[in-house]
Structures are given as structure tokens and as C-alpha cells.
């Protein structure tokens, strides 16, 4: 939940005054990543100048650069890292020439982006959501208890601001990194298909399925915890309504709700976009296969014609009679021109008439709930109706019952923003999700 206390002109003037700049060609970035990797293996988090030179030597060898000027180039690279505030240098008068180097927050942030944040972990996300859920519950309990301004700052505002908001930002960063990974997968698939699409089919399928699985796993984890998180945020928001001096808490809760909604919404939208891309790739592969078949046949036919005098051949072809479709798509199921007139005893009653009669009966029966002001549980009512009809009519009957029920009134629980529980309505797996109608 980033907030800037300075204005844009102040930030620009500050950056210009301090001469901030970052320039990291691929070899310098590789050197920084090597330093971060070696630094992570040390307990004290410190590196000497000799260790930095050794790391630079590895990078120089990987880029096939000359080793004659390794000392000068390593010294220039280290000084450049210090100037760009990627490394901090600490010198001592007792040990002159043996400086100690530590990565700055900027250096850690850049290397963390390229190294640690590249891996998606469901366990890590689950732990983050578990921590957020615990913090939100404690904050909601503290909000329900109430107290003075110090109580709200210490037990409600602080956990939301410095724990929940930062974890939400971390999850948002994970989503943005996965956006980049999707683009990288698309580039890899495009390169595979441009080289040899036959050999690339299995690799493309693997990349598509892995990315789809990762996106779905992330979204399922978010949706499973999203309702509980929103419920606790609503508890805090309800507790602040009676206090005019807690606008800072209310504004923070609103920002967190928007952030959570945006995270879950973009997760689903990202899945939908990836499904569209998946279909596009499969359509391209199918088209390529069809075109390649025609191309191979044309090439073989051309070679056969060119070598006819050396290897004569005969062409046999078959031209079967075309099968005509005798079905009239516009013909009604029981058109009088086809079936003739039926006796009155065999007249078929159209489904629309049956539906109107059934709707009238159900409307009359459901009106009892409104007259008595009794709560109407759609799950139980629909299940009772479906038990009276064959399975083939369950969908139509359930739709009629629900249409008539929602005309009678609304459920006050709908205004809380919490989803209703799924209730089974028949023995074949059908379920309905609806609050009890209690306001007519």
C-alpha cells in the first residue's frame, strides 16, 4: 500500500539533487547477481574486495572477456556499483586496503526481483494468506472491543498498515511477475513454432499446461481465503462507522478492500486471457498440420510429374455420388404439412402452456410465504418441488421456482456482501446458492 508524502515536483528535485541513476548492462547485472548469490551463502552478509574480484572473474570468463585486465575492470565495476548505491563500502584505518562491502537495499531489491521472486510457491502464498487472515482477525476483534485513539492506532491501524498491506503488495507483485512469465512463455512458444512445429508440439503443450496450472493454483488459493478476509475487513469497517475520528482507519480498510478485489479480479481475468491464448495456439497448430498435409501432397505430386518418363505411373480416382441432406432445418417438429391433423384426443400441449400453468401454481403456493411473512429457504423449497417431478424436468422446474421466488422479496443477507452456502436440491448433484428470502 504505497503512499507518497512528497509531491511530484519535490520527488523530481530530490532525485536530481542526489544524482540518482542506474545503468546495468548485462555483464554488470550478471556481476551483481553473482555477488548477491555468494553473499547469500555467508552468515555475516559481508564480502571482501578479493571475493568481489573472484566473482567478477567468473562473470568475465562466462562472457569470454580477456583476463589480462581483470583487476582494472573489476575495480571499475566495483566503484561503479558503489557510485550507483548498489554496494556500500566500509573502510578501516587499521586495515587499509581491505574494505568490506555490503549490498544496499536497492541492490537487494534488484537481485531479489531477478532471483527469489521468479519462483512461484503455493506454500509461500498459503502462508502469506494465513498470516493475513490472523492479523485481520485480531484487528477485527480489537475493533469490536473499541477503545481510545491509542488502542485503534496500536491494535487496528498498525497491523493493517504494516503487515496486511505489505503482504497484499507482495501478492500483487507475484501476480505482476507471473504476467511477465506468461509473456516469456508466449515468446518461447513462438520461437519453438517458428523453428520446427512438429518437434515443438509436445514442448508447447507442456508450457501451456504448466502455466495454466500455476494460474489456476494461484487463483484457487486466493478465492479460498478471499471471503474470510473480506468478512473481517467488513467487521472493522462496521466498527468505525460510529466514530467520526477514525476516518484514517476507514480509508485504509477501503484501500485494502480495493486491493484485495483487484488481486482476485485480475487473477480470474488473467486465467481467461490465457485460455484464449491457449485456444489460439491450438488453432494455429491444427491449421499448420492441415496446411502441411496439403504441402506434402503437392510436393510429392510435383515430383511424380517431373519424373514421369523415368518412372511412369497411373492415376486412379473415384468420384462418389454426393450424399444429400434431406433434413429441413426450418421444419417444425410436428408440422401439420408433415404429420397431418391429429385427433383432438391426441393434441400435443406445447411446453409453453405447461410452463405457464406450472408457474401459476407455484406462484400461488409461494404466495403463502409472503402472506405469513415467513422466511423462504430456496434450497429446501426447490428440493421439495423437484422431488415431485422426473429428472428430465428438474432444470425447468427449478428455474420456474426461483423466478417466482425472487419476485416475492429479497434476502437481507445479500446486503452483507457474503456469499451464500451451496445447498443440494436433488440427488443428482444439482445445487443452488441463495440466501433465505426474509423481506417481502
Curated annotation (Swiss-Prot):
Pfam family, one: MukF_M
Any one Gene Ontology cellular component term annotated for this protein: cytoplasm
Source taxon at top rank: Bacteria
GO biological process, alphabetically ordered: cell division; chromosome condensation; chromosome segregation; DNA replication
HAMAP family: MukF
Quaternary state and interactors: Interacts, and probably forms a ternary complex, with MukE and MukB via its C-terminal region. The complex formation is stimulated by calcium or magnesium. It is required for an interaction between MukE and MukB.
Name of the protein in question: Chromosome partition protein MukF
Species whose genome carries this gene: Citrobacter koseri (strain ATCC BAA-895 / CDC 4225-83 / SGSC4696)
Gene coding for it: mukF
Amino acid at each position: 500500500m504505497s503512499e507518497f508524502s512528497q509531491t511530484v515536483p519535490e520527488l523530481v528535485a530530490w532525485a536530481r539533487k542526489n544524482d540518482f541513476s542506474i545503468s546495468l548492462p548485462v555483464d554488470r547485472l550478471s556481476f551483481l547477481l553473482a555477488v548477491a548469490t555468494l553473499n547469500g551463502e555467508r552468515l555475516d552478509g559481508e564480502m571482501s574486495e578479493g571475493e568481489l574480484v573472484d566473482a567478477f572473474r567468473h562473470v568475465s570468463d562466462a562472457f569470454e572477456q580477456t583476463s589480462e585486465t581483470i583487476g582494472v575492470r573489476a575495480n571499475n565495476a566495483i566503484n561503479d556499483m558503489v557510485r550507483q548505491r548498489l554496494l556500500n563500502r566500509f573502510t578501516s584505518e587499521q586495515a587499509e586496503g581491505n574494505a568490506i562491502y555490503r549490498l544496499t537495499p536497492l541492490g537487494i531489491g534488484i537481485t531479489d526481483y531477478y532471483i527469489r521472486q521468479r519462483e512461484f510457491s503455493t506454500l509461500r502464498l498459503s502462508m502469506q494468506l494465513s498470516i493475513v487472515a490472523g492479523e485481520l482477525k485480531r484487528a477485527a476483534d480489537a475493533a469490536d472491543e473499541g477503545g481510545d485513539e491509542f488502542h485503534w492506532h496500536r491494535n487496528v491501524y498498525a497491523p493493517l498498515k504494516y503487515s496486511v498491506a505489505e503482504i497484499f503488495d507482495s501478492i500483487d507483485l507475484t501476480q505482476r511477475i507471473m504476467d511477465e512469465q506468461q509473456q516469456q512463455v508466449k515468446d518461447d512458444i513462438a520461437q519453438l513454432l517458428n523453428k520446427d512445429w512438429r518437434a515443438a508440439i509436445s514442448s508447447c503443450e507442456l508450457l501451456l499446461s504448466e502455466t495454466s496450472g500455476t494460474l489456476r493454483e494461484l487463483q484457487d488459493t486466493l478465492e479460498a481465503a478471499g471471503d474470510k478476509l473480506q468478512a473481517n475487513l467488513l467487521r472493522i469497517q462496521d466498527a468505525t462507522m460510529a466514530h467520526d475520528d477514525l476516518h484514517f482507519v476507514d480509508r485504509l480498510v477501503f484501500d485494502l478492500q480495493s486491493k484485495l478485489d483487484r488481486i482476485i479480479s485480475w487473477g480470474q481475468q488473467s486465467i481467461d486471457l490465457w485460455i484464449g491464448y491457449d485456444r489460439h495456439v491450438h488453432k494455429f497448430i491444427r491449421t499448420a498440420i492441415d496446411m502441411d498435409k496439403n504441402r506434402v501432397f503437392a510436393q510429392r505430386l510435383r515430383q511424380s510429374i517431373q519424373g514421369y518418363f523415368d518412372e511412369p505411373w497411373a492415376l486412379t480416382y473415384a468420384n462418389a455420388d454426393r450424399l444429400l441432406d434431406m433434413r429441413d432445418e426450418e421444419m417444425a417438429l410436428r408440422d401439420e404439412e408433415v404429420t397431418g391433423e391429429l385427433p383432438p384426443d391426441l393434441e400435443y400441449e406445447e411446453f409453453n402452456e405447461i410452463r405457464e400453468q406450472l408457474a401459476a401454481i407455484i406462484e400461488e403456493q409461494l404466495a403463502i410465504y409472503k402472506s405469513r411473512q415467513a422466511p423462504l429457504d430456496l434450497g429446501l423449497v426447490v428440493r421439495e418441488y423437484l422431488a415431485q417431478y422426473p429428472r428430465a424436468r428438474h432444470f425447468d422446474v427449478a428455474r420456474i421456482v426461483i423466478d417466482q421466488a425472487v419476485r416475492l422479496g429479497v434476502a437481507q443477507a445479500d446486503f452483507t456482501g457474503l456469499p451464500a452456502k451451496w445447498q443440494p436440491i436433488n440427488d443428482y448433484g444439482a445445487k443452488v446458492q441463495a440466501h433465505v428470502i426474509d423481506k417481502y
